[in-house]
Regions:
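Beta-lactam-recognizing serine transpeptidase/beta-lactamase-like catalytic domain environment
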Residues: 7, 31-71, 83-211
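Conserved, well-ordered alpha-helix/loop/beta-strand core segments that scaffold catalytic motifs
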Residues: 1-31
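Short alpha-helical catalytic segment bearing the HExxH-like zincin motif
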Residues: 75
Length: 211
């Protein structure tokens, strides 16, 4: 029987070199990446460092970072949140919000998060580095990578239950059906309203690069 891989030797070579360069330049402890063909989902490149050689007998690190390591993905998750709002019909076209800081209240009986004009018992959420972008449309909020825009989207337009459903539909927070490769499921953290909001911009909940 023949075994045919989707990996592209040229892509894999560039990926491996890039990971090594990233490790050296940033002095980080680990780095990992996947290159995926958008149209088909084929994995063209897969790598993680530190790596291991199966020919060695004193291996101390077997972790495949791209599939086994769950982490908070950061702002790349904002695209998923926006996509969920768009696909579910909840995207606020031509609406705007006030950026900089998001204060809010939470109704435990309904699960409703509401923006507040003043600080509450819940932790405030700000845009990166405390920047004040002023009033933005939601399109502009995406361009500016506004955390507050995500919070307003989740509070006013995209219900938490719908957001959670779309995370699962996108394949997050669950094992990926790929043969012969172990992979973590990630961790959904919707324990507090701040966690729901933070998940929208890539914090609190964790996923894997493979997902």
């Amino acid at each position: 029987h023949s075994l045919v891989l989707t990996l592209d030797a040229n892509v894999q070579s560039v990926l491996e070199t890039s990971l090594q360069t990233t490790m050296k330049d940033s002095k980080c402890e680990s780095a990992w990446a996947l290159v995926v063909e958008v149209e088909t989902g084929k994995i063209l490149g897969w790598g993680s460092y530190p790596s291991f050689d199966m020919n060695e007998h004193d291996i101390t690190q077997y972790l495949n970072m791209a599939s086994d390591n769950a982490y908070e993905p950061g702002s790349v998750m904002k695209g998923i949140t926006y996509a969920a709002a768009l696909d579910s019909g909840n995207y606020p076209y031509n609406q705007s919000f006030r950026a900089k800081t998001f204060n809010y209240t939470y109704d435990e009986s309904t699960g409703k998060i509401s923006r507040s004009s003043k600080k509450t018992v819940y932790p405030s959420i700000s845009d990166a580095l405390g920047r004040d972008f002023g009033t933005l449309t939601y399109d502009e909020g995406f361009i500016r990578s506004s955390n507050v825009g995500i919070c307003c989207l989740l509070a006013d337009y995209l219900p938490a239950a719908t957001f959670e459903e779309y995370l699962e539909r996108f394949g997050f927070l669950q094992s990926v059906d790929i043969p012969f490769v172990s992979n973590a499921t990630g961790v959904k953290n919707f324990s507090h309203p701040s966690d729901i909001l933070s998940t929208g911009f890539g914090q609190s909940s964790s996923v894997t690069a493979l997902q």
